[in-house]
């Protein structure tokens, strides 16, 4: 399968964020990755999942929610990593940019969020009800989305490791507040980062099935 891959800089508010847009031939949808704190678009886990998506004709955009300068500051002060409204606003800005780009303007969009990035994805989905076709949360903290959970209309898949007991409970509580179609899948034997053999492959499989169902 032929992929068209482009390094892009997207203006969002007063800054520009950097990303990698990959569009396989025949792609009808694009999945935007919202990474968690301390991660980036170069994360080996997200890179692996993105490649699996591409093999299934799903486009992907891996981008950094923070600028390089903000990342440097965050390492020292942690002032940005839990600023979920800021992260959500960046995701919204990037989504709107894709909607206006000739290559992607007619495609369906999905969000793949990890850890705190999942909360940002859910807030963005709540604020863009007509734009986001589906959301997948990997080891996410949907509880950080707070009051916005009830406003999410996009079908949402919550993936949590079976050994990540605290996060399982938080996801169960968040599900109770959601009125959209939602599903919680607990992956046995997996911890928070799904580092155990074969567990990230399961994440990719469940996610691909979900996105292919809704990104049309």
Regions found by a protein language model. Name each.
Residues 178-193:
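Catalytic histidine neighborhood in serine/cysteine hydrolases
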Residues 165-170:
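Conserved alpha/beta-hydrolase "acid-adjacent" motif
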Residues 8-107, 198, 202-203:
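Serine-hydrolase catalytic machinery in alpha/beta-hydrolase-like enzymes
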Residues 130-142:
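A conserved short beta-strand
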Residues 152, 158-160:
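Short beta-strand/loop motif that positions the catalytic acidic residue
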Residues 198-216:
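Catalytic active-site module of serine/aspartate enzymes centered on a nucleophile-bearing elbow/loop
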Residues 110-113, 138:
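Short beta-strand immediately N-terminal to the catalytic nucleophile in serine-hydrolase-like folds
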Residues 113-121:
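Gly/Ala-rich beta-loop-alpha elbow adjacent to hydrolase catalytic centers
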């Amino acid at each position: 399968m032929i992929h068209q891959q482009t390094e892009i800089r997207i203006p969002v508010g007063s800054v520009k964020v950097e990303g990698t847009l990959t569009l396989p031939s025949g792609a009808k949808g694009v999945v935007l990755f919202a990474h968690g704190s301390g991660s980036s678009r170069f994360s080996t886990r997200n890179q692996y999942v993105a490649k699996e998506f591409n093999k299934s004709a799903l486009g992907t955009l891996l981008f950094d929610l923070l600028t390089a300068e903000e990342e440097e500051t965050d390492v020292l002060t942690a002032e940005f990593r839990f600023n979920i409204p800021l992260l959500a606003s960046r995701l919204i800005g990037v989504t709107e940019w894709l909607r206006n780009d000739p290559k992607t303007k007619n495609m369906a969009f999905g969000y793949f969020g990890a850890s705190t990035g999942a909360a940002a994805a859910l807030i963005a989905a709540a604020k863009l009800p007509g734009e986001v076709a589906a959301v997948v949360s990997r080891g996410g903290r949907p509880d950080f989305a707070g009051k916005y959970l009830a406003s999410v209309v996009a079908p949402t898949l919550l993936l949590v490791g079976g050994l990540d007991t605290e996060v399982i409970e938080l996801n169960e509580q968040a599900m109770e507040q959601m009125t959209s179609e939602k599903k919680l899948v607990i992956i046995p034997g997996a911890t928070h980062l799904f580092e155990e053999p074969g567990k990230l492959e399961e994440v990719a499989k469940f996610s691909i099935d979900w996105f292919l169902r809704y990104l049309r």
